[in-house]
Structure formats: structure tokens, C-alpha cells
């Protein structure tokens, strides 16, 4: 029995370490890359442009730089990816945002249906400079959550801010449950 435990216990620990490592990696691996091109699912609204940038990045050597004159939007139109994420209980959106100029205003993230309804949304406070992480579950977002037929994410420029830019990186619409620890901060109260 003692000899058997000597082999079984390390095997169990190795299995658990492998499983935990895979879950953690799946939760944080960026699904959308800005290394070689801007994915076709991104569409800039009027008064804005998007380009790849090596100026500020979190993963690899590039991020998505979005510059705008208000009002404007940046849309992500990948119905399939959004639906796969929304079907997972406890899933959500994860990204990093670099803000070069702090403003006392909120950027709105709206998950919209094909008819323009907004069952999920959140505001991200922009009174910071540098990088900030944004991890939020769909079920923690305000909204009526009545529809699961989300077809796009629309990011809207902050009200009262004439122009600006920000950098996005490590954008992921998780397809696994995010951890349950709620960590509100100044960006997402």
C-alpha cells in the first residue's frame, strides 16, 4: 500500500496541476490578436480611426490604437464569437485598456442585438493613465439580459470629451467561466 501511494499521490498532483494550468490559460489567453492585422470584425464609426500600434502593448508587440473625435464608436461584429461566449454560464469579456490622458468620464460598452436592443452593457471610467484591466462577467453587467442574441459590441466615446485615443490589447470573449471573485474598482464600480 505504501509503495502504491508513492506513485499515486504524485500522479494525482501532476494531473491537478495540468488541469488547473489549462483552465487558467484558457481564461487568460487572448482570442483576438492585434499582432499582424486589425481583425475584419472591427468597424470604426464616423470621426474615428483604428490602426495597429507598437507604442503601447500588453501582449506581443502591438495593440489596437483607436483615435476619435466625439461622438464616435468602435464596433466588434463577430456574432459567432460573441454567441459562443454568451452561452457559457459565468463567462464575460476581458481586455486591457491603455489611456494616455485621464478624463473624468465613462466609456460605454454595449452588447447589442441585431435590432439594436442592449441586454448587456457597462461603463468603464477613464480617469486614469496607463494600463487598466477590464474583466467583467455578462451576468454582472447592467441591462435586462432578456436576449442572448447579441450580434455586436459597441464601444462609445465618453460624453463631454471632444477627442481622444486609447489602446486595446488582450481582448477575449471568454468561453470558460470566469472566477467568482468580485473586484470592483474606480473603472468598473
Label every model-predicted segment.
Residues 1-8:
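N-terminal secretory signal peptides that target proteins for export/translocation
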Residues 9-21:
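Bacterial N-terminal signal peptides
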Residues 25-47, 177-189:
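Extracellular carbohydrate-recognition regions
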Residues 27, 45, 57-59, 86-90, ...:
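Short, surface-exposed loop/turn motifs at beta-strand boundaries within globular domains
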Residues 52-74:
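Short carbohydrate-recognition loop motifs
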Residues 68-144, 161-167, 172-177:
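Extracellular ligand-binding interfaces
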Residues 154-162:
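Short beta-strand-plus-loop segments that form exposed binding edges in beta-rich domains
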Amino acid at each position: 500500500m505504501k509503495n502504491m501511494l508513492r506513485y499515486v499521490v504524485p500522479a494525482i498532483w501532476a494531473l491537478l496541476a495540468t488541469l488547473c494550468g489549462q483552465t487558467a490559460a484558457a481564461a487568460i489567453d487572448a482570442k483576438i490578436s492585434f499582432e499582424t492585422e486589425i481583425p475584419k470584425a472591427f468597424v470604426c464609426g464616423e470621426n474615428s480611426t483604428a490602426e495597429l500600434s507598437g507604442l503601447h502593448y500588453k501582449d506581443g508587440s502591438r495593440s489596437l490604437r483607436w483615435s476619435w473625435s466625439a461622438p464616435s464608436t468602435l464596433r466588434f461584429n463577430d456574432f459567432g464569437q460573441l454567441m459562443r461566449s454568451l452561452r457559457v454560464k459565468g463567462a464575460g469579456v476581458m481586455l486591457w485598456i491603455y489611456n494616455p490622458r485621464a478624463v473624468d468620464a465613462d466609456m460605454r460598452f454595449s452588447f447589442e442585438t441585431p435590432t439594436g436592443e442592449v441586454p448587456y452593457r457597462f461603463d468603464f471610467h477613464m480617469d486614469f493613465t496607463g494600463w487598466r484591466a477590464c474583466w467583467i462577467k455578462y451576468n454582472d453587467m447592467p441591462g435586462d439580459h432578456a436576449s442572448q442574441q447579441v450580434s455586436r459590441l459597441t464601444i462609445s466615446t465618453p460624453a463631454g470629451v471632444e477627442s481622444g485615443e486609447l489602446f486595446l490589447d488582450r481582448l477575449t470573449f471568454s468561453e470558460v467561466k470566469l472566477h467568482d471573485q468580485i473586484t470592483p474598482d474606480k473603472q468598473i464600480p
